[in-house]
Swiss-Prot record:
Binds RHOA, PPP1R12A/MBS and PPP1R12C/MBS85 through adjacent coiled coil domains. Interacts with MYZAP. Binds F-actin through its N-terminus. It comes from Mus musculus. Targets myosin phosphatase to the actin cytoskeleton. Required for the regulation of the actin cytoskeleton by RhoA and ROCK1. Depletion leads to an increased number of stress fibers in smooth muscle cells through stabilization of actin fibers by phosphorylated myosin. Overexpression of MRIP as well as its F-actin-binding region leads to disassembly of stress fibers in neuronal cells. One of its GO terms (cellular component) is cytoskeleton. Residues 43-150, 386-482 form the PH domain. It holds the Pfam family PH. The modification Phosphothreonine is found at residues 295, 645. InterPro entries: Actin_Cytoskeleton_Reg, M-RIP_PH, PH-like_dom_sf, PH_domain. This is Myosin phosphatase Rho-interacting protein. Residues 179-190, 221-233 have a biased composition (Low complexity). Residues 152-262, 274-301, 328-379, 486-583, 972-995 are annotated as: Disordered.
Length: 1024
């Protein structure tokens, strides 16, 4: 044991000898911790929208009391965990979890929070505060949650009797026994796979056949252990596939079998057993249950009623779209379905506390509250969950503006406020009346995910943040506006609850002891069974036969609800047994009404004279029997027609357009009124028939008295002839009465048949006229749409062509303006070039003048140089010649001449230097002029190139625009203008310099070429 404590067994595997113990550690199932697989496989048993107080809220602090409560979707699972998330989608991760197995108490929180309809869930860790919108919702949650603290307190008291406490106590809805097929089947998970098999119709037939094989119910299964058997029920009999009240109570006794004391099982651990336990319960001795007939026909009728309830359950499950809360019979596990195969109906489910069901021994509310699986089916369709929703949506107004509002769906309207604070202050911004809503569709909008609410007043466009929110709103509004699929809030009354569940919860003895007129004898049933065996369908059944019965039950429930609503308030406090007896009485009256048409019943007549008299006139009574049979067939057909009439108008698809919906609705209403009138006439006819049958019975009594008189006459008291005359008169009167009754009945049948044909003809004519009107409207609408589309296409084409033409004209004008600007620039450039050419010519002339002056200066300089050289040579000769001859005589004269010559030489040298400087300056000026000339020629070339490129580009643009204009003109069907000049400006006709611009381009080029060649030649000559 110490090793087991150190290494706890994490996986429960059932022991083959005791399936409530683990084969590894031999500890009970509840001592094993729940793993993730158990949590994911757990079934939700209750759920709904509630308001949760934020964490850390201290309601003793006035500041915290003004905090906003968070709206969350709460789900209570069968393992005792209460989880809450942002929405009701099953894929949404929960924001938090409250372990109800550790809950110590659930108390009213209004005193602490100051909020109505609030609860406080006390756990050892913290306190959780929840709040609902209405009293019914919070009462339902209180009833569901109070089970856990009570159970936890009971477990504390029973610690001496049961196993040691476990690390995690399972919830009251957690099962205690697993794996109905053996130990290996439960080894894969803590919740056995055998329990995952859904309840099907085949299991009901197997239970019926098993009950037939063991009618006495005294033998026990050999595989059953004493610890697996259940204590006997206190008051109610055990039924296969039907949950009894004893399953909800706490079993706390010790059973001794064979001198061994068996471990006591708590009530919430014994909710589910294996098939062997079920067989043990079914095979308990009859003294444990009240005596009731166990004929095969009664068993068959019970199974048929179970199948009808199962069909209704599945049909209603298909109509609901709540994926989390719906736990239909197809999803219940097989371990539970063996004890309770058919959940209670959810026709009038609500969150209000349910009244005690009609049973043989009604249990206390404390014991009834422990039926968590019963609440799992009743809470799957609650009025508050379907007909109440809040959230942020965006509404589109008539001017196209979008505005965000806080929407609240309640009653027959969709109200919207500025925010939730405005809702609490009743500051209403607007309201959408849903009483006339007939459809809610998705609508594509530019903002988020849109949908439209279609009403007679108009269409309202809303948008949600996500597609999931939009889908939830559409489903909620559709269920809200369709009263057949959404349950009525008034059904939360105890009377409605009793009426909705009376067919399933009535005891077996009451149903078996009801008289069923017209029931076939055992020989007929045997022959039918033989026929089915010959046809290969010994265990099959035609389920289409149950639909009229099931619809009749639904009609009876609706009529019962209507009568209870119109009755006095004292009817609400009626006992369940009285309601069940009232329902059985109505069912019996209806059967009698049909049974009286089958057989003309009367007291047993042992008088041989009467039998002789009836045998003497078989022809008189044979025809009435045949006619009454025909009448019975006709009435059965009429009832079948009434029962199969669809009662849910919202499920019918309208075939007429919107403007015909009012007429069709009025026609449909008139049809239903006529149907109700016909039903009333039929009931009146049936009453008259019963009165006539009563008269017939009185006549038969008179006939019996007459026969008695005849017998007395034989004894000598009355003459025989008098008796014979009285008997003949009585027989004639009786025959006339029967004939009158038959004729009256035939007339009524003819009248009903004619009325039916007339109604069918009117309905057919109305349908045909509606279809024709719809076709005509559709045809006219199509023609209007085609004309509108053609007109829009033509107008769009014309507007496109006109816009294209305007665009072309604008482009053409812009190009013309650009050409004018370019021509002006070209003229200015030409003027500048002319001025530059003139300046260049002046510079050339100045250069030539300078060159001539330079040449003259060079010649003068040469002449001076020659003269200087000659003078120097002369002086030298004079000096040399005179020096030899006159050196002695003229020294002073020679010195003077030499001085003069030196001075003259210096003067000449200075002149030469001045001339050289002037020549160099002239050379510099010439080089400067040559550079200016080169710069001017280069600039002229660049300007000319730019103007040529601009002119070529302008020519290309003009040609392209001409082509585009021509194409546009051809597209418009107009004749293109020929020979028209697009550009009214000639680039060669410039006003600024007309003489210069009129020259040919070749002449200008030639002149420029000559000027360039001349300048080059001069430059070369100058350099040389």
């Amino acid at each position: 044991m110490s090793a087991a404590k150190e290494n706890p067994c994490r996986k429960f595997q059932a022991n083959i000898f005791n399936k409530s113990k683990c084969q590894n550690c031999f500890k009970p199932r509840e001592s094993h911790l729940l793993n993730d697989e158990d949590l994911t496989q757990a079934k939700p048993i209750y759920g709904g929208w509630l308001l949760l107080a934020p964490d850390g809220t201290d309601f003793d602090n006035p500041v915290h009391r003004s905090r906003k409560w968070q709206r969350r979707f709460f789900i209570l699972y069968e393992h005792g965990l209460l989880r809450y998330a942002l929405d009701e989608m099953p894929t949404t991760l929960p924001q938090g979890t409250i372990n109800m197995n550790q809950c110590t108490d659930v108390v009213d929180g209004e005193a602490r929070t100051g909020q109505k309809f609030s609860l406080c869930i006390l756990t050892p860790d913290k306190e959780h505060f929840i709040r609902a919108e209405t009293k019914e919702i919070i009462s339902g949650w209180l009833e569901m949650l109070m089970v856990y603290p009570r159970t936890n307190k009971q477990n504390q008291k029973k610690k001496r009797k049961v196993e040691p406490p476990t690390p995690q106590e399972p919830g009251p809805a957690k099962m205690a026994v697993t794996s109905s097929s053996g130990g290996s089947s439960g080894s894969s998970s803590s919740i056995p796979s055998a329990e995952k098999v859904p309840t099907t119709k085949s299991t009901l037939w197997q239970e019926e056949m098993r009950a037939k094989d063991q009618p006495d119910g005294t033998s026990l299964s050999p595989a059953q252990s004493p610890s697996q058997s259940q204590p006997p029920a206190a008051c109610t009999p055990r039924e296969p596939g039907l949950e009894s009240k004893e399953d909800e109570s706490t079993i706390s006794g010790d059973r001794v079998d064979g001198g061994r004391k068996v471990r006591v099982e708590s009530g919430y651990f014994s909710l589910e057993k294996a098939k062997q336990d079920l067989r043990a319960e079914e095979q308990l001795p009859p003294l444990l249950s009240p005596p009731s007939p166990s004929t095969p026909h009664s068993r068959r009728s019970q199974v048929i009623e179970k199948f009808e309830a199962l069909d209704i359950e599945k049909a209603e499950h298909m109509e609901t779209n709540m994926l989390i809360l719906t736990t239909p019979s197809s999803d219940t596990r097989q371990g539970r379905s063996e004890r309770r195969a058919i959940p209670r109906k959810r026709d009038f489910a609500s969150e209000a506390p349910t009244a005690p069901l009609s049973d043989a021994c009604p249990l206390s509310p404390h014991r009834r509250a422990k039926s968590l699986d019963r609440r799992s089916t009743e809470s799957s369709m609650t009025p508050d969950l379907l007909n109440f929703k809040k959230g942020w949506l965006t509404k589109q107004y008539e001017d196209g503006q979008w505005k965000k509002h806080w929407f609240v769906l309640a009653d027959q309207s969709l109200r919207y406020y500025r925010d939730s604070v405005a809702e609490e202050a009743a500051d209403l911004d607007g309201e959408i009346n849903l009483s006339t809503c007939y459809d809610v569709t998705e609508y594509p909008v530019q903002r988020n995910y849109g949908f439209q609410i279609h009403t007679k007043e108009g269409e309202f466009t809303l948008s949600a943040m996500t597609s999931g929110i939009r889908r939830n709103w559409i489903q909620t509004i559709m269920k809200h506006v369709l009263p057949a699929s959404a349950p009525d809030v008034t059904s939360s009354l105890p009377e409605g609850k009793n009426k909705s569940t009376s067919f399933e919860t009535c005891s077996r003895s009451t149903e078996k002891q009801e008289a069923e007129p017209g029931e076939p004898d055992p020989e007929q049933k045997k022959s039918r069974a033989r026929e089915r065996r010959r046809e290969g369908r010994s265990k099959t059944f035609d389920w289409a036969e149950f639909r009229p019965i099931q619809q009749a039950l639904a009609q009876e429930r609706a009529s019962a609800v209507g009568s209870s609503d119109s009755g006095d308030p004292g009817c609400l406090e009626a006992e369940p047994g009285e309601l069940e007896r009232e329902r059985a009485r109505r069912r019996e009256e209806r059967r009698k009404r049909f049974g009286m048409l089958d057989t003309i019943d009367g007291p047993g007549m042992e008088d041989t004279a009467l039998r002789m008299d009836i045998d003497r006139s078989p022809g008189l009574l044979g025809t009435p029997d045949l006619k009454t049979q025909n009448v019975h067939v006709e009435i059965e057909q009429r009832w079948h027609q009434v029962e199969t009439t669809p009662l849910r108008e919202e499920k019918q698809v309208p075939i007429a357009p919107l403007h015909l919906s009012l007429e069709d609705r009025s026609e449909r209403l008139s049809t239903h009124e006529l149907t109700s009138l016909l039903e009333k006439e039929l009931e009146q006819s049936q009453k008259e028939a019963s009165d006539l049958l009563e008269q017939n019975r009185l006549l038969q009594d008179q006939l019996r008295v007459a026969l008695g008189r005849e017998q007395s006459a034989r004894e000598g008291y009355v003459l025989q002839a008098t008796c014979e005359r009285g008997f003949a008169a009585m027989e004639e009167t009786h025959q006339k009465k029967i004939e009158d009754l038959q004729r009256q009945h035939q007339r009524e049948l003819e009248k009903l048949r004619e009325e039916k044909d007339r109604l069918l003809a009117e309905e057919t004519a109305a349908t045909i006229s509606a279809i024709e009107a719809m076709k005509n409207a559709h045809r006219e609408e199509m023609e209007r749409e085609l004309e509108k589309s053609q007109r829009s296409q033509i107008s769009s084409i014309n507007s496109d062509i006109e816009a294209l033409r305007r665009q072309y004209l604008e482009e053409l004008q812009s190009v013309q303006r650009e050409l004018e600007v370019l021509s002006e620039q070209y003229s200015q450039k030409c003027l500048e070039n002319a001025h530059l050419a003139q300046a260049l010519e002046a510079e050339r002339q100045a250069l030539r003048q300078c060159q001539r002056e330079n040449q003259e200066l060079n010649a003068h300089n040469q002449e001076l140089n020659n003269r200087l050289a000659a003078e120097i040579t002369r002086l030298r000769t004079l000096l040399t010649g005179d020096g030899g001859g006159e050196s002695t005589g003229l020294p002073l004269t020679q010195g003077k001449d030499a001085y003069e010559l030196e001075v003259l030489l210096r003067v000449k040298e200075s002149e030469i230097q001045y001339l050289k400087q002037e020549i160099s300056s002239l050379k510099d000026e010439l080089q400067t002029a040559l550079r200016d000339k080169k710069y001017a020629s280069d600039k002229y070339k660049d300007i000319y190139t730019e103007l040529s490129i601009a002119k070529a580009k302008a020519d290309c643009d003009i040609s392209r625009l001409k082509e585009q204009l021509k194409a546009a003109t051809e597209a418009l069907g107009e004749k293109s203008p020929e020979g028209t000049t697009v550009s009214g400006y000639d680039i060669m006709k410039s006003k600024s310099n007309p003489d210069f611009l009129k020259k040919d381009r070749s002449c200008v080029t030639r002149q420029l070429r000559n000027i360039r060649s001349k300048s080059v030649i001069e430059q070369v000559s100058w350099d040389n």
